[in-house]
From Swiss-Prot:
Claim: Membrane is one of the keywords in the record: yes
SMART domains: Haemolytic
Pfam families per record: YidD (PF01809)
Any single GO CC term annotated in Swiss-Prot or TrEMBL for this entry: plasma membrane
Keyword Cell membrane: yes
Membrane topology: Peripheral membrane protein
The protein's name: Putative membrane protein insertion efficiency factor
Family: Belongs to the UPF0161 family.
Record key words, sorted: Cell membrane, Membrane
PANTHER family to which the protein is assigned, alphabetical: MEMBRANE PROTEIN INSERTION EFFICIENCY FACTOR-RELATED
Annotated source species: Clostridium perfringens (strain 13 / Type A)
């Protein structure tokens, strides 16, 4: 499961992300955050952390530096 999520994120970063303008409000980007979270905490917890991060990445959030803890 962990490897599947990582492959999906890498596919997104290589083929889908270049087609749209940069819009992430955080550093590291949401996709990089997701990779790090899944590698560090596994598919279940890392996946939930990634979903939370993506939900926070919107025009109403200030953004900024937000590393995986």
């Amino acid at each position: 499961m962990k490897k599947l999520f990582i492959v999906m994120i890498k596919f997104y970063r290589k083929y889908i992300s270049p087609l749209k303008r940069p819009c992430c409000r955080f550093y590291p980007t949401c996709s990089q955050y997701a990779l790090e979270a899944i590698q560090k905490y596994g598919a279940f917890k890392g996946g939930f952390m990634s979903i939370g991060r993506i939900l926070r990445c919107n025009p109403f959030c200030k953004g900024g530096y937000d590393p995986v803890k």
